[in-house]
Amino acid sequence: MIPEIDIKDYSYPLTEDRIAKYPLPERDSSKLLVYKDGEVSERVFRELPSILPGGGLMVFNDTKVVPARLHFAKPSGAVIEIFCLEPSDPPEYDRAFAASGKCRWKCVVGNSKRWKEGPVSLLNPHGSPEIEAMDLQAVLIEKDGRTGLVEFSWKQGLPFSRVLEIAGTVPIPPYLNRESESIDLERYQTTYARWRGSVAAPTAGLHFTPATISEIRQGGTLIADVCLHVGAGTFLPVKSEHISGHAMHREPFSIKLDLLRQLRDGGREVTAVGTTSVRTLESLYYAGVSCIEKGYPEDVSQWAPYEREYPYSTQEALDALIKFLEDRGEDTLVLGTRIIIVPGFRWRIVDRLVTNFHQSESTLILLVAAFVGEDWRRIYDFALSEGFRFLSYGDSSLLYRKK
């Protein structure tokens, strides 16, 4: 049954001065709130390796943020902002980034009322010869509200990934209330980012340095990666009074066969780095159920966890995914998920969560509340009273699931 949750019950007072507008000089110098067995304490993030018990499994999201925000101008001078969401032709990320000369993307279009037809040209306010030679143009193929299908074309034989590097800016969150700057190119990206495709960083990972990860490994924790490309929906507020009226956007994810086997075999407590890793890991059960019942894994729907009781164990669901890949000689599961995690969710894989402090009345606050119960209020009250910095560039927390 879809939970009837009033989003107003998950609000807290966050003033502008508590939002971190810029990262700290050192990634691992942020504060770390630790919640365990109902107790809340304050540490420093670089102490995380000594806090984590050994013998566990830590899962990161190794997606990479792309400079997906582009500014074009009509011949009339009207500025059109185009925010690339996901590739359409070619539909695979790797092929789309390698495309030369032309490609199509699903985009959010700013000032779309002013763009009915005809090509628009990339703005070049500083007269860059590189931008001039590239001659990047965009045509709106079809429109659906604020989103649309946009065809990009350019010269010079460059791959589209290079086009974005030259022409695009990092799409930092709107609540920072500033334009992206050179510091964001490095710091709004995890040190282990690998696969291009996100329009928002998995911000829990921003605190990790290679040294931190190395120390965690040395403490006996296995390190593994999933990849979920974070979509623009991560910035969308919940506008409906009840969470049942909120629509989650599809986000593509992938996970290696070896990690599926590790999760199935168990014996290690799982620490997820960030809510995107959580949503990927907890989607696996429902993909496995689809595999058991239909013979193949389907994208995970928003309300799959709440629609009915499932008779299968987590091991059975993971087994089904493993067999599906093995039968096809494949080593990576690639799917999409719209899963929403709210109070009442049945946890199957994740035991601990590293996460930042999220916006009031957001789906991410609901995920935290599902993880720690009503203690989410104590956690946030503590963070507010002790001067923690909030949101993407803010401080972090290590939460142990309430069992």
Task: Give the positions of each predicted feature.
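Surface-exposed, charge/polar-rich loops and edge strands
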Residues: 1-403
